[in-house]
């Protein structure tokens, strides 16, 4: 490209007197071309929006004939105007505030976005929205019906093949081709021309097979709503609604006394809640405002929640969280076929870049929201495991860091499942070492781009089951003048470090605890981690480690080199964001075996300080291999920083004893190599054999262990 530019400049110089004239024409032509492209893109966007509106109008005309189960939208506050959709699904007007609304005010004006299907509406329009959300519980139905809807959300998760009509195989959404507006199914994500729908429904009906993700989607025909449909259920609903409305009235009155109430033409907006019983019976919480007053209403937003501190356009209101928790408690699973293998999803909203809410919405659109759970201080993995307590075969996807994975594995182990569910990982943390080893990627970027999340879910469906060793760490602290003798216990699945690496992790952890809002990016987190490492290069606080720490492996004392500032005990082949410390692929002059995450053996290496860690990161050095063994004891004579799977703490004088605890089932993405496909196929064969009673759960576990050893 630069060569072309230099050639053009030389040609203009050689043109002599005509060069200014030629240059002017080139500039004019470039500006004109950009104007044409801009106009075309704007026209294309307007045309697409008109098609969506046309599809919405067509759906309203035939909605009663579609015979789809009705369901209310699950509205949450959303401040992300830059994200799709940009049009209100009720009034069909833009969701972006007008020019006469200040930028500061527009940031605090929420829209309502459905957490289930992704449509959005003005906060004053949402109460009038049609009950056309996908029904997540349809127990008693013979089959799932297509839930056709206008395509408000531009789903990047749709593969290229879904850009064609499900019935006629003609392209959808291309303005130059004569075609009708399109609908898309909220379950299988297929597209169909509106004009083709009537023909298809007459010929083959409207049964939906859930599309390419049918094996991981929890079918709504097997989900039952627990709340009674009788008087008790109605009274409970009315009671909850009345409590919510009374709280709304009290907040309005309080704001009115302080002069901060939201107003419209000088009047407080309390008329919508003046008669709570009437409001509940009519199913309305806020009356629909007239369109000619919308801008006035948007200007008076002093009582609306502030957008500062919210992540990914998702509101952080407690009422949204409590509503989500109540929503998940309503359901149970019934009549699942014996070979059903639904995917149970756990999302840690605070992991890594705090992308959990955005990912939660995307997964709700692709899967059944009943099978997606958000982990936090109010809800742990038990809620999801309770839902699947009677499901013999299911799989688990953990969206979070290594700490979140350990949390879920602990909860699974406590359940004592006859066939424990294997676990896949969608990495949201900073290091994501276990995710790297299992081939699931190094960060959230693995599901960015066209069709990536859909492809990721399909990879889970075809993943191979492998084993992962879990280790028990017994922490003993000797009694001192300041501290009495104590004994603790933790689990380890990745690595344990003591010395310089743990000190860096400890300082990083303390900073994140003090100011968590500054740690919202994986890239920034790594920069801060590097900053702490650079500081330790100068401090060398762990230079006396060889004299304060001694190592015992399988009952034998192991000498620690005098220049060591850190010891690292490894269970997997990835450390600190992808560093291979044991280096199986290199030749070594020792007699140690290769490293494996399910051989019930640990590896021990040492590092020479933070500078050495930095060189390891970029592949300019190697860690020194010290030992392999099944029982590791680390004796400490003075306080030293320790980290277990990234969780740092200060170890007082005492002993760390690491012993094998057990093995857990993990899902490993099938590689392109023949062995990877063979492992995935063998998993299917073993599961089918167990379903048919040929083998039992314990026999399957033994065979999986042997297969993991030979095919990994």
Swiss-Prot record:
GO biological process, one term: root development
Tissue: Expressed in rosette and cauline leaves, flowers, siliques and roots. Highly expressed in young leaves and at lower levels in older leaves. In young seedlings, expressed at the root-shoot junction zone and vascular bundles of the cotyledons. In older plants, expressed in root tip, central cylinder, root hair, leaf mesophyll cells and guard cells, sepals, filaments of the anthers, stigma, valves of young and early adult siliques and hilum of seeds.
Induction summary: Induced by cold stress. Induced by wounding.
Activity across pH: Optimum pH is 7.2.
Zinc finger (Phorbol-ester/DAG-type): 72-133, 145-208
InterPro entries: ATP-NAD_kinase_N, C1-like_sf, DGK, Diacylglycerol_kin_accessory, Diacylglycerol_kinase_cat_dom, NAD/diacylglycerol_kinase_sf, PE/DAG-bd
Keyword entries, A-Z: ATP-binding, Endoplasmic reticulum, Kinase, Metal-binding, Nucleotide-binding, Plant defense, Repeat, Stress response, Transferase, Zinc, Zinc-finger
Main location per the UniProt record: endoplasmic reticulum
Superkingdom, natural source: Eukaryota
Subcellular location: Endoplasmic reticulum
Reaction it catalyzes: a 1,2-diacyl-sn-glycerol + ATP = a 1,2-diacyl-sn-glycero-3-phosphate + ADP + H(+); 1-octadecanoyl-2-(5Z,8Z,11Z,14Z-eicosatetraenoyl)-sn-glycerol + ATP = 1-octadecanoyl-2-(5Z,8Z,11Z,14Z-eicosatetraenoyl)-sn-glycero-3-phosphate + ADP + H(+); 1,2-di-(9Z-octadecenoyl)-sn-glycerol + ATP = 1,2-di-(9Z-octadecenoyl)-sn-glycero-3-phosphate + ADP + H(+)
One term under GO cellular component: endoplasmic reticulum
Listed EC numbers: 2.7.1.107
Residues in DAGKc domain copies: 338-479
Quaternary data: Monomer.
Task performed by this protein: Phosphorylates the second messenger diacylglycerol (DAG) to generate phosphatidic acid (PA), another important signaling molecule. PA is required for plant development and responses to abiotic stress and pathogen attack. May be involved in the accumulation of PA during cold stress. Involved in response to freezing stress by modulating the accumulation of PA. Exhibits high specificity for the unsaturated DAG analogs 1-stearoyl-2-arachidonoyl-sn-glycerol (1,2-SAG) and 1,2-dioleoyl-sn-glycerol (1,2-DOG).
Protein name per Swiss-Prot or TrEMBL: Diacylglycerol kinase 2
Source organism: Arabidopsis thaliana
């Amino acid at each position: 490209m630069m060569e072309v530019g230099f050639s053009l400049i030389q040609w203009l110089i050689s043109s002599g007197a005509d060069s200014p004239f030629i240059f002017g024409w080139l500039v004019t032509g470039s500006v004109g071309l950009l104007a044409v492209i801009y106009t075309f893109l704007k026209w294309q966007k307007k045309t697409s929006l008109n098609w969506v509106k046309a599809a919405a109008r067509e759906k309203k005309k035939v909605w009663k004939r579609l015979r789809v189960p009705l369901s209310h939208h699950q509205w949450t506050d959303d401040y992300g105007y830059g994200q799709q959709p940009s049009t209100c699904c009720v009034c069909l007007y833009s969701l972006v505030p007008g020019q006469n609304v200040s930028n500061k005010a527009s940031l605090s004006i929420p829209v309502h976005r459905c957490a289930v299907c992704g449509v959005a509406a003005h906060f004053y329009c949402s109460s009038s929205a049609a009950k056309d959300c996908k029904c997540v519980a349809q127990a008693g139905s013979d089959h799932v019906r297509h839930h056709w809807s206008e395509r408000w959300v531009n789903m990047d998760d749709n593969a290229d093949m879904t850009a064609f009509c499900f019935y006629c195989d003609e392209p959808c959404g291309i303005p130059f081709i004569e075609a009708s507006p399109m609908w898309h199914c909220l379950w299988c994500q297929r597209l169909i021309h509106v004009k083709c729908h009537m023909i298809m429904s007459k010929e083959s009906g409207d049964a939906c097979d859930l599309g390419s993700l049918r094996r991981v989607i929890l079918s709504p025909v097997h989900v039952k709503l627990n709340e009674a449909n009788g008087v008790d259920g109605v009274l409970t609903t009315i009671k909850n609604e009345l409590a919510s409305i009374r709280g709304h009235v009290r907040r309005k009155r309080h704001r009115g006394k302080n002069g901060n109430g939201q107003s419209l033409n000088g009047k407080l907006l309390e008329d919508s809640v003046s008669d709570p019983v009437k409001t509940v019976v009519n199913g309305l919480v806020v009356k629909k405002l007239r369109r000619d007053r919308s801008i006035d209403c948007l200007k008076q937003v002093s009582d609306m929640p502030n957008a500062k501190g919210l992540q990914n356009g998702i509101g952080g209101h407690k009422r949204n969280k409590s509503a989500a928790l109540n929503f998940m408690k309503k359901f149970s699973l019934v009549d699942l076929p014996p070979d059903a293998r639904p995917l149970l999803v756990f999302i840690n909203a605070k992991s890594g870049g705090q992308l959990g809410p955005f990912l939660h919405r995307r997964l709700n659109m692709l899967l059944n929201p009943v099978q997606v759970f958000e982990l936090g201080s109010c809800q742990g993995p038990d809620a999801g495991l309770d839902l699947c307590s009677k499901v013999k075969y299911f799989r688990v996807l953990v969206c979070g860091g290594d700490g979140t994975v350990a949390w879920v594995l602990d909860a699974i182990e406590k359940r004592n499942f006859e066939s424990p569910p294997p676990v896949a990982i969608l990495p949201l943390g900073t290091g994501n070492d276990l995710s790297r080893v299992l081939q699931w990627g190094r960060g959230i970027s693995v599901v960015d781009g066209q069709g990536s999340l859909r492809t990721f879910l399909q990879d889970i469906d075809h993943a191979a089951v492998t084993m992962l060793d879990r280790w028990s760490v017994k922490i003993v602290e000797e009694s001192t003048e300041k501290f009495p003798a104590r004994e603790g216990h933790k689990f380890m699945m990745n690595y344990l470090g003591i010395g310089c690496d743990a000190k860096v992790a400890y300082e990083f952890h303390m900073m994140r605890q003090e100011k968590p809002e500054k740690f919202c990016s994986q890239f920034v987190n790594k920069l801060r981690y590097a900053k702490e490492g650079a500081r330790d290069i100068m401090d060398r606080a762990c230079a006396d480690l060889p004299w304060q720490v001694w190592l015992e492996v399988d009952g034998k004392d192991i000498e620690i080199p005098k220049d060591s500032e850190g010891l690292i005990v490894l269970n997997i082949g990835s450390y600190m964001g992808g560093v291979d410390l044991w280096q199986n692929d290199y030749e070594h002059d020792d007699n140690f075996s290769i490293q494996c995450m399910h051989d019930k053996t640990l590896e021990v290496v040492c590092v020479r300080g933070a500078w050495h860690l930095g060189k390891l990161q970029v592949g300019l050095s190697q860690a020194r291999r010290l030992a392999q063994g099944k029982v590791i004891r680390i004796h400490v004579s003075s306080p030293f920083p320790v980290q277990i799977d990234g969780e740092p703490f200060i170890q007082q004088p005492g002993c760390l004893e690491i012993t094998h605890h057990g093995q857990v089932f993990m899902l490993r993405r099938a590689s392109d190599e023949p062995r990877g496909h063979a492992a995935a196929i063998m998993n299917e064969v073993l599961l089918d054999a167990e379903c048919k009673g040929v083998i039992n759960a314990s026999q399957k576990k033994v065979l999986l262990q042997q297969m993991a050893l030979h095919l990994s």
